[in-house]
Amino acid sequence: MPCIYFCSIYFLAMEFLYILQDGRMGYCGTRPSVDVIQAESRIVGGHDAELGAWPWQVSLQIYRVELGGFRHECGGSLINHNSVLTAAHCIKKWVNPEYWRAVIGLHHLYKQNAHTVNCRVRNIVIHSNFKTGSYENDIALFILLKTVKYNDYIQPICLPDISHLLADENTCYISGWGKKEAKGKFQKILQEAEVEIIPLYICNGHDWYKGSISRDMICAGSESGFHTLYMYLKNFYNTPQTKGF
């Protein structure tokens, strides 16, 4: 039986997108520096991602006065030259875009490299029907102050077609610098893991979410067991397709 996310490890503050080929987006969902998904990616609990493995991964960071600098708050996905899609619940009280920056092309959370680009944020758009209690419509868009140039380590993800449906047990990949424990520290190196879409009737069972997960949400996990259930509702996942992600 599957568990939600990894059972022994769960990632907080990570947001993901379906990696789907969408003709409306044009050139997207490609990983120039990585030829194929490595077979060893199927590791329960996740592991360090290869440099450039997820070139749309973004670290959304907020300036903390008490720290005297920026701190990673949550992940996002680059969807074009100046827009990052993330979860609305990450923003919390920090709705002023001047507090934020987007770090793109990042691998080590605390060490930027030659491929890294820092962008300040022009505007933050939160879904008008976002509900904090149920996580319905948990989507937000960060509009960047400058245009980002694509390279082998910075690429946009493809958005899913509105009519696309993910089948149960469809394989997806997740990535981020999330914490292993609720009060733990963020991971230094970008993490990745393989998960499967879990049927809603399992997630909505009496022992788990008791019907609180709607059909607009996605439940995903591993095959290692069902003894622990941790999930962020309406996260986004990376799903390989024929022509890209």
Predicted features and spans:
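Protease-domain processing segments flanking chymotrypsin-fold serine proteases, especially trypsin-like
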Residues: 1-85, 106, 233-236, 240-245
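Active-site substrate-binding loop(s) of clan PA
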Residues: 113, 126-131, 147-187
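Conserved active-site neighborhood of the chymotrypsin/trypsin-like protease fold
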Residues: 84-88, 136-161, 189-190
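Extracellular trypsin-like serine protease catalytic domains
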Residues: 34-43, 57-68, 161, 170-245
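Extracellular/periplasmic catalytic domains that process cell-envelope and extracellular macromolecules
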Residues: 48-53, 78, 94-96, 132-135, ...
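Conserved H-D interstitial segment of serine endopeptidase catalytic domains
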Residues: 30, 37, 42, 60-63, ...
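Gly/Ser-enriched beta-turn/beta-hairpin loop segments
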Residues: 48, 111-116, 133-136, 151, ...
